[in-house]
């Protein structure tokens, strides 16, 4: 058994491993958005008679990502630090090789690479945290609220005017099932408009600082099954947006951003109102009766939730699929970063920034 960095010759066997290990059609397209991916892919290989016949039996990939860190104690109010993290993904082992510790060894090699590359910490998302905890990763939790959608006849908040309207940014029927470049929705929708709102809405610990590559390539992939609703001002400018996914009877809220100001300022409240009403209408069209709201603990999220869900039968839970591990930073700092999701700083990580 050999542990090493992947080469172009390993790609067919690597992809075959992932096909056998996962039912995840986005795995390869997302992986291929990373130009330096092979240099950051650790593989366990069973040598074959020739290099072309080597068999990849385990893998761990990582990609650099910049996150918002803890509040800066010496800077102006609201200033934060940043961290460069190694985002771990595509962790796999062949079914006939499991139980040999291959993933643990590949993770250790990946952490060594991250340390050499100057990563502060490592981030991953998983439904099996027990696999990673022995290697130093620990979970963090973000809030999730579930409940019944408000009925059609529910009173809508009073508005002084009707200057903001919602638009469903529908996909073109000619687009492939999995878009690989922006726009994922209407062709006249520039990603820069969404990015401006996103960047100003919630700058908090654990949030990814998105680049143009994220917006142009990764966001369309992670939200390829989602619907985008925008709130538009009288001049057509985007003053808010909401990303939702419909799965059976459940509407899942994946991302929200609205313009500057408090949640109760007229234009911001109106944007939240029309986005929630449009989401309820979309849910009715698809037969959904319940919603799952995964948003940070901020006033705008509370307003949206109250306009989506009935007050009764709500369940407050958490999503604990995210995990962090220190690399060059101290354990105490990374523990403090994990704890921000339940603090007033409302740390958060968006699904569109999964790895």
Model features per residue range: what roles?
Residues 4-6, 56-112:
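Well-ordered mid-protein domain cores that form the structural environment of catalytic cofactors
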Residues 15-77, 205-228:
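Active-site rim helix/loop that mediates acceptor-substrate recognition in acyltransferases
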Residues 43, 52-65, 85-92, 236-246, ...:
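Conserved beta-strand in the GNAT
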Residues 82-95, 249-266:
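Conserved acetyl-CoA binding element of GNAT-fold acetyltransferases
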Residues 88-93, 99-112, 116, 124, ...:
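Conserved acetyl-CoA-binding loop-helix of GNAT-fold acetyltransferases
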Residues 115, 120-133, 293-302:
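Conserved beta-strand-loop-alpha-helix junction that forms the acyl-donor binding cleft
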Residues 136-157, 254-355:
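Active-site/acyl-donor-binding loops of N-acyltransferases
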Residues 138-261:
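Amide-forming acyltransferase catalytic core, primarily the GNAT-like/NAT-type
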């Amino acid at each position: 058994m050999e542990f090493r960095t992947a080469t172009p010759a390993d790609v067919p066997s690597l992809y075959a491993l992932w096909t056998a290990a996962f039912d995840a059609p986005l795995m390869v397209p997302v992986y291929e958005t990373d130009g330096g991916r092979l240099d950051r892919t650790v593989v366990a290989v069973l040598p074959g008679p020739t290099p072309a016949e080597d068999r990849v039996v385990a893998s761990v990939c990582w990609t650099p990502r910049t996150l918002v860190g803890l509040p800066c104690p010496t800077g102006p109010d609201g200033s934060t630090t940043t961290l460069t993290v190694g985002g771990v993904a595509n962790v796999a082992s062949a079914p006939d090789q499991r139980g040999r510790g291959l993933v643990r060894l590949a993770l250790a090699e990946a952490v060594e690479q991250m340390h050499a590359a100057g990563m502060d910490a490592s981030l991953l998302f998983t439904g099996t945290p027990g696999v990673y905890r022995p290697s130093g990763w620990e979970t963090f939790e973000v809030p999730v609220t579930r409940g019944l959608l408000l009925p059609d006849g529910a009173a809508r908040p009073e508005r002084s005017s009707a200057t903001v309207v919602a638009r469903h940014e529908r996909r073109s029927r000619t687009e492939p099932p999995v878009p690989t470049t922006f726009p994922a929705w209407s062709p006249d929708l520039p990603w820069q408009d969404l990015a401006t709102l996103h960047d100003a809405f919630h700058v908090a610990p654990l949030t990814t600082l998105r680049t143009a590559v994220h917006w142009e390539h990764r966001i369309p992939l992670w939200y390829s099954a989602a619907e985008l609703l925008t709130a538009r001002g009288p001049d057509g400018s985007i003053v808010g947006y909401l990303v939702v996914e419909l799965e059976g009877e459940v509407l899942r809220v994946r991302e929200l951003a609205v313009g500057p100001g408090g949640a109760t300022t007229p234009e911001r409240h109106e944007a939240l109102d029309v986005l929630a009403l449009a989401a309820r209408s979309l849910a009715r069209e698809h037969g959904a009766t319940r919603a799952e709201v995964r948003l940070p603990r901020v006033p705008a999220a509370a307003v949206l939730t109250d306009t989506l869900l009935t007050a009764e039968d709500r369940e407050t839970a958490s999503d604990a699929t995210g995990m962090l591990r220190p690399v060059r930073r101290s354990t105490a700092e990374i523990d403090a970063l994990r704890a921000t999701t339940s603090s007033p700083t409302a740390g958060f990580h968006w699904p569109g920034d999964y790895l």
